[in-house]
Amino acid sequence: LFLKLVREAHKRGMKVIIDGVFNHCGTRFWAFRDVIRNQQQSRYAGWFDVKRWDDPSTSQNEFTYKGWWDVRDLPEFWEGDSGFVKPVWDYFFNITRRWMDPNGDGNPSDGIDGWRLDAANEISHVFWKGWRSLVKSINPNTYVVGEIRDDASKWLKGDEFDAVMNYPYARAVVRFFIDTDSRRLTASEFDRELAKIRG
């Protein structure tokens, strides 16, 4: 159904950008469900940042894991200094190929046109550099925008993202044009905020 939407959007001259969440998943994600069921014996046990496995000899469930911003419903994928473990890396690369060139014929015209990457600053630069190489090899015109909450200069060197969501600018604009309370910026305060952003 989604690929039909992409096809119809393309017929109308529209581009489709999807939200890619590679830092964490939900508790209903198939690999995480397998980890819950099979604990250390799960073939996906190394995919997640598990802090403690359940001890079946006790009545309580000791299974704990790292959740994104401590949100238990959003288990984080385990990532070391060099990025995700290979099976996770491969999984993300495969889903990237799936949505960018759905039929795998080397022609990406039936796939999506871009990615908005959630919590991008929480994933290693090593991963993003490799991922961008894959993305641009499939379709050099793919638009890649990362969610970076603060200074994004490290991600904008031409080897990771094409753009970022500019939260500092957005916050300043909202405070100047929209806020009506004590957070509202005067014109000179707004100018100073923009100068800080420009560096």
What are these regions (language model features)?
Residues 1-108, 131, 137, 153-154, ...:
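Substrate-binding/active-site clefts of carbohydrate-active enzymes
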Residues 10, 24, 33-39, 57, ...:
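Active-site-proximal helices and loops of the catalytic beta/alpha 8
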